[in-house]
Amino acid sequence: MRKLGFAITMLVAFAVGPAPLAQSAEGFAKALHIYDNYRVVPNITYLTANNWDAKLDVYQARDAKGPNPTLIYFHGGGWVQGSKEAASLTFLPFLEMGWNVVNVEYRLGKVSLAPAAVQDALCALRWVYRNGKDYNVDTGRLVLMGNSAGGHLALTTGMIPASAGLDSLCPGTEELKVAAIINWYGIIDVNELLAGPNVRNYAIAWLGGMSNRDEIAKRVSPLTYVRTGLPPIISIQGDADPTVPYSQNVRLHQALDNAGVGNMFVTVPGGKHGGFSDAEMAKVYAEIRGFLDKQNIARLSAN
């Protein structure tokens, strides 16, 4: 009954979601394909904060043999909206590759302001480290991915060191290392979005009226943590993105180059904030697969 309820929730999320695919028969068909062909363990509580249970879903091929590479996915929505259920089609290509997927929800701004979402994402990664063996997860081949605010969270989760103190809600001794980060048009410099020509209402809403918001914004900005030794990072963005300034990801990859971090920046010419064509998506996923192959991440376990 629990899984049936989850399937219905997922289908409803697609039906009311913002993406055109979510409103189409194709979207429903793909949602049913996921439910029919993959084992889904839904709504596992990985953290309780602000009297709110943060949950995640684990997806696996029904005939999975492990341990296998695993994608940890964070949905978008400007840190103030969105849901994990409405994002499931985004990571379908990884399921088709035989990967496990961990689909994470986190505290939105209406529950708790920044840096809550960043803290939650770090706790989700720690949960995977502690529980992954129960789901055939190869913790040596963890890849973080997200779009927009989720891209930001994928970056912060893979870049923020323990010394930053942002994992205080789930302390532990595990070194939270990941094999790669896939950033779809994520926010790189939160401070830049709080004032000036690139101000964005969603960033202001996430930081609220806190007196130290500039300090918090810097603490949760991926650009703050660029340094030697980071995992390889691939970013994807349209150069006509009206929601997240394209220049932010240009700056990120310039900084990664300067730090000697393996990286790749895939630009979609004329692309907006997602909504890329099928042909563009095919090219992007070919680039992602090639990038992961170079890191020796994509292969499945032979066990």
Q: What is each model feature region?
A:
Residues 1-4:
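Positively charged n-region of N-terminal signal peptides that target proteins for export
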Residues 7-17:
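Bacterial N-terminal signal peptides
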Residues 18-22:
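Sec/Tat signal peptide C-region and signal peptidase I cleavage site
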Residues 23-303:
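Alpha/beta-hydrolase superfamily serine-hydrolase fold, recognizing
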